[in-house]
């Protein structure tokens, strides 16, 4: 429940930030335009983001004939989660990772790299796919799509404010120093809010995945393995499309310093500790 409240508050914050920037650029009219612009971008993302992401990763759809063990595993977990059967995809990549996409449970897809299938045991793989189906059940793909779109739009509006200035309610030019400050600080604030939402949803998907599979320890050991293997294997498609990093079960981007501050995922150690506590107590709340 705490993660859901936190997510709602953060989404309200990123929406408010977007509208405030619109107001700084063009007063009440600017706020209205900013809101309409955000709605248009979210509409496009809602309907087409899954196709775009699967194409970016050159994901190939599989069925029971082409990937019988993997497909049956997803079907069994979807049944346990009371979800429609999602489309199932494989990505020919050595880096171990997986993600879910789709605008709702009826139009969902799950994808895994060939690398993760080689690295993990069947039990661990069940834990991973249960995590992805938890994202589907919680409609996290919609949440992440909206926040990513809003964060990108905030950055675009902030740049517009810096280069073209803005107007107050009376039509007078806005303070240029304020425009520069907005251009520098607003994208950072938007990105931080986006990352906080993503981290909250990852914790919730870990918990939900543990409930679906009934085996939190399997997901814990899977996360440990993915973390260790992924550190030495570049995920080229993810590096080329860093905005999609938040979709993955493990952050696929390499680097440290500021990149850790803007990480889309919680610390792996903390995720594992929470899952092991679930395994010890048998409680998923």
From Swiss-Prot:
The chain crosses the membrane at residues 7-27, 30-50, 146-166, 177-197. Binds 1 zinc ion per subunit. The active site is at residue 132. Coiled coil: none annotated. Its EC number is 3.4.24.-. Pfam families: Peptidase_M48 (PF01435). It is a multi-pass membrane protein. One of its GO terms (cellular component) is plasma membrane. Its main location: membrane. Keywords: Cell inner membrane, Cell membrane, Hydrolase, Membrane, Metal-binding, Metalloprotease, Protease, Transmembrane, Transmembrane helix, Zinc. One of its GO terms (biological process) is proteolysis. The keyword Cell inner membrane applies. Gene3D superfamilies: Metalloproteases ('zincins'), catalytic domain. GO terms for molecular function: metalloendopeptidase activity; zinc ion binding. It is found in: Cell inner membrane. Its cofactor is Zn(2+). The keyword Phosphoprotein does not apply. Zn(2+) binds at residues 131, 135, 202. PANTHER family: PROTEASE HTPX (PTHR43221:SF1). NCBIfam families: PRK01345.1, PRK03001.1. Belongs to the peptidase M48B family. This is Protease HtpX homolog. It comes from Burkholderia vietnamiensis (strain G4 / LMG 22486) (Burkholderia cepacia (strain R1808)). The gene is htpX.
């Amino acid at each position: 429940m705490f993660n859901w409240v936190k997510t709602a508050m953060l989404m309200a914050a990123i929406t408010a930030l977007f509208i405030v920037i619109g107001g700084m650029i063009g007063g009440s009219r600017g706020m209205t335009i900013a809101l309409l612009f955000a709605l248009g971008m979210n509409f496009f993302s809602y309907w087409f983001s899954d196709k775009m992401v699967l194409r970016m990763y050159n994901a190939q759809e599989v069925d029971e004939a082409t990937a019988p063990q993997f497909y049956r595993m997803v079907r069994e977990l979807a049944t346990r989660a009371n979800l429609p059967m999602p489309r199932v995809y494989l990505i020919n990549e050595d880096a171990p990772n997986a993600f879910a996409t789709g605008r709702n449970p009826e139009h969902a897809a799950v994808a895994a790299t060939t690398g993760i299938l080689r690295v993990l045991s069947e039990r661990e793989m069940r834990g991973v796919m249960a995590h992805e189906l938890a994202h589907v059940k919680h409609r996290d793909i919609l949440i992440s799509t909206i926040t990513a779109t809003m964060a990108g739009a905030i950055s675009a509006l902030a740049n517009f404010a810096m280069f073209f200035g803005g107007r107050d309610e009376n039509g007078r030019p806005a303070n240029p120093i304020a425009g520069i400050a907005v251009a520098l600080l607003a994208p950072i604030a938007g990105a931080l809010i986006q990352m906080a939402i993503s981290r909250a949803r990852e914790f919730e998907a870990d918990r939900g995945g543990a409930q679906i599979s009934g085996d939190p320890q399997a997901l814990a050991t899977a996360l440990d393995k993915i973390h260790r293997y992924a550190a030495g294997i570049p995920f080229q498609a993810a590096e080329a499309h860093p905005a999609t990093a938040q979709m993955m079960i493990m952050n696929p981007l390499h680097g440290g310093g500021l990149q850790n501050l803007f990480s889309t995922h919680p610390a792996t150690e903390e995720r594992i500790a929470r899952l092991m506590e679930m395994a010890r107590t048998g409680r998923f709340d």
